[in-house]
């Protein structure tokens, strides 16, 4: 006979590391070329003028300038777009 109660096993008890997604440069901020503007999954924010898109949908600045967010009408829903305006 067992002298201790057997411990059960569980299939839970693990978690993934956070991916640190989100906006990295907000509207009105000045950025340099190559700066990451937004880390995202999918294109919830579309790239605009002077903004590139990486293979993981990360948006980054192509030139130095000021970050600007804008809302654009696309079909029945509004989409967000981020642009980098050249600094004067």
UniProtKB/Swiss-Prot annotation:
Transmembrane segments: none annotated. The keyword Ribonucleoprotein applies. InterPro entries: Ribosomal_bL27, Ribosomal_bL27_CS. Pfam families: Ribosomal_L27. GO terms for molecular function: structural constituent of ribosome. Residues 1-24 are annotated as: Disordered. One of its GO terms (cellular component) is cytosolic large ribosomal subunit. Belongs to the bacterial ribosomal protein bL27 family. This is Large ribosomal subunit protein bL27. It comes from Synechococcus sp. (strain CC9311).
């Amino acid at each position: 006979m067992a002298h201790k109660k057997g411990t059960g096993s569980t299939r839970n008890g693990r978690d993934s590391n956070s991916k640190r997604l989100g906006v990295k440069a907000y509207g009105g901020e000045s950025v340099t070329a190559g700066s990451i503007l937004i880390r995202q999954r999918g294109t919830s924010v579309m790239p605009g003028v002077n903004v590139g898109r990486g293979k993981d949908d990360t948006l980054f600045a192509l030139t130095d300038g000021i970050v600007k967010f804008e809302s654009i009408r696309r079909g029945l829903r509004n989409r967000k777009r981020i642009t980098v305006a050249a600094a004067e």
